[in-house]
Amino acid sequence: MKKRAIVLLSGGLDSATVLAMANADGFETYALSMRYGQRHSSELEAAKKVAAALGAVRHEIVDLDLRKFGGSALTDDALDVPTDGVQSGIPITYVPARNTIMLSLALGWAEAVGARDLFFGANAVDYSGYPDCRPEYVAAYETLANLATKAGVEGERIRVNAPIINMTKAEIIQAGVRLGVDYGLTVSCYKADDAGRACGVCDSCRIRKAGFEAAGVPDPTRYV
């Protein structure tokens, strides 16, 4: 029987690449997305298409409305998504504890289906402003996962994989192209419309556009 992995899948470029990488590593992949009240909800439609295209065994979308807490431009309509260029520091698009919340959901599903590997698209190179995308965070969460689960206590080590954490956006795109990822299916924009068309000026769009240019790969993104 093939080993199983839970892959966090937002519908964006990074997580699509990570799903393809997990497949290439020989895993039977289970894709997990979250409807957390993000204003760019069209990314979930993208996630469905990516999961199907890359052959995930299952794709689950969990509802957990983080708009009740606010604190991020992605979940609070009173906060504007920045469009004036990438700044230093933790950006207002940081969703409080989002990766911890999503990895915890993935960890629960992993135990339920006998998976011992979690994959997610943390990246600390092109955009290092998010505290839950750092290598030390990944290592700390893996420690927690093995302390907090039946599988971990019984010696079936759980691994938290962040295969693109030290890659540039161009390197990620080039790797995905080699693995057959159709980036035209993905949505990265923080302000994408209901059709998945990108604004072209938010931080995520700027980084994505620069990545395709640096990679020498045609940008398939649909812009408003």
Swiss-Prot record:
Catalysis performed (reactions): 7-carboxy-7-deazaguanine + NH4(+) + ATP = 7-cyano-7-deazaguanine + ADP + phosphate + H2O + H(+)
GO MF annotation terms: ATP binding; ligase activity, forming carbon-nitrogen bonds; zinc ion binding
Pathway assignment: Purine metabolism; 7-cyano-7-deazaguanine biosynthesis
Superkingdom in the source lineage: Bacteria
Cofactor dependency: Zn(2+)
Any GO BP annotation: queuosine biosynthetic process
Binding site for ATP: L9, S10, G11, G12, L13, D14, S15, A16, T17, V18, L19
Cofactor details (free text): Binds 1 zinc ion per subunit.
EC top class, as a word: ligase
CDD domains: QueC-like
Pfam families: QueC
Keyword ATP-binding: yes
Annotated Zn(2+) binding sites: C189, C199, C202, C205
Keyword check for Hydrolase: no
Enzyme Commission (EC) number: 6.3.4.20
UniProt keyword list: ATP-binding, Ligase, Metal-binding, Nucleotide-binding, Queuosine biosynthesis, Zinc
HAMAP family xrefs: QueC
NCBIfam families for this protein: 7-cyano-7-deazaguanine synthase QueC (TIGR00364)
Described function: Catalyzes the ATP-dependent conversion of 7-carboxy-7-deazaguanine (CDG) to 7-cyano-7-deazaguanine (preQ(0)).
Family: Belongs to the QueC family.
Protein name: 7-cyano-7-deazaguanine synthase
Gene field: queC
